[in-house]
Amino acid sequence: MPTRETVQRYFEELTRKGNWESLLSEDLEFTSFTSPVKHVTGKAAYLESTRRFFSMIKSLEVRDLIIEGTKACALTRYQLQSPAGSFQSDVAELFTVTDDRIHSLAIYFDTAPFPK
């Protein structure tokens, strides 16, 4: 499956709370360029470190998707719900796709809207 299809399917599955995890490589490299920067290796570690975020997603919009070979950049807007209320987060997500799986993911976003 080409890079575009893999990344689009990831977002489609994530939106409908489907089987998006199946698109992740077991040796996924994840970096969150927030303060402090967080880096984890492995699908299980990624899922554990992002569980709170994924539990808050009400909806998401892929505002732009740029593909070049095995690389993809998605500009996304998440509508999120926490016990403290609703908020949105704009995120830049950089993917590397290998063998139809997401091998690396780096994200950039402002942490200010997130509840402490």
Residue ranges and their predicted role:
Residues 1-16:
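Short, aromatic-enriched amphipathic alpha-helices that serve as compact interaction elements
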Residues 4-5, 18, 25-69:
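A solvent-exposed, acidic/Ser-Thr-rich amphipathic alpha-helical stretch
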Residues 69-78:
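A short hydrophobic beta-strand element
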Residues 78-80, 97:
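Hydrophobic beta-strand positions in extracellular immunoglobulin-like domains
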